[in-house]
């Protein structure tokens, strides 16, 4: 694990953070001018009403920071390309969702089936290329036990479930100032350790880049938030987690590393089903 560590990982975190810190002061006023502000329903809590009009789509700077830092400091392997593809694919879905809600004033954004179709396509492409070109197997690794089980074609179903579950979990957590970005910083640092353990240095660089971008974003997103990441950021960051879980064969470890997201999702499910 220590042998796999190199300074490019630290530089990637620093570079991603600098991109976010440099872009933020210019992007946030532009989002204000374009009226890319978040709408808060009138029946919501008074504390949330103050957030009405706060620019959203701040995830643009996070994704930009991660992408630039990864391309500079990581070798552009198929694994890195797939990781970026998962993130950028969900970034596009999130951007379209935010644009429809904020600019076109259609509160529901993309239809659920449209999002699911996009995620289904991303999952199939990643799984097919991963299995055929990176040595990705259809085995599932059980954490702590260390056993692997070949689940055959059902692995495609698992990948789709991981993508949809993880991205929506991060999306649900993006309701409080700094919560999603802070939780993602912790989770990405955890995955950096996982990548180092499995000697996947380039994916570790990608993880460190995510860590740096999320920590820097807290400057603008910590209470009181000057900008929200929006679906643009939350879906993309969910894609980061899901992609790392899939490419390191630690899909089930996501439940632990993304523990806060799991708790938040369960909380929402309990609240919805109890009414």
Feature names for model-found ranges:
Residues 76-111, 115-116:
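Hydrophobic alpha-helical hairpins/lids featuring a short glycine-rich hinge
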């Amino acid at each position: 694990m220590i042998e796999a560590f190199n300074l490019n990982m630290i530089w990637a975190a620093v570079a991603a953070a600098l991109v976010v810190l440099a872009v933020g002061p210019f992007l946030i006023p532009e989002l204000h001018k374009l009226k890319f502000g978040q709408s808060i329903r009138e029946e919501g809590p008074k504390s949330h009403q103050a957030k009405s009009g706060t620019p959203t789509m701040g995830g643009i700077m996070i994704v930009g920071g991660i992408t630039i830092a990864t391309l500079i400091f990581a070798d552009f392997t198929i694994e890195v390309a797939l990781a970026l593809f998962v993130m950028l694919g969900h970034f596009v879905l999130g951007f379209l969702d935010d644009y429809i809600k904020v600019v076109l004033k259609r509160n529901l954004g993309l239809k659920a089936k449209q999002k699911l179709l996009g995620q289904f396509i991303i999952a199939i492409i990643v799984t097919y290329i991963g299995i055929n070109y990176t040595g990705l197997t259809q085995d599932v690794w059980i954490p702590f036990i260390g056993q692997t089980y070949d689940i055959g074609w059902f692995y495609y179903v698992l990948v789709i479930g991981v993508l949809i579950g993880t991205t929506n979990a991060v999306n649900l957590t993006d309701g409080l100032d700094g919560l999603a970005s802070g939780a993602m910083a912790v989770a990405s640092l955890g995955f950096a350790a996982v990548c180092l353990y499995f000697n996947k240095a380039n994916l570790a660089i990608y993880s460190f880049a995510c860590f740096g971008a999320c920590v820097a974003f807290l400057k603008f997103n910590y209470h009181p938030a000057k900008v929200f990441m929006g679906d643009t950021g939350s879906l993309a960051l969910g894609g980061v987690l899901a992609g790392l879980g899939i490419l390191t064969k630690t899909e089930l470890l996501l439940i632990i590393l993304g523990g806060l997201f799991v708790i938040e999702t369960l909380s929402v499910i309990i609240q919805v089903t109890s009414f």
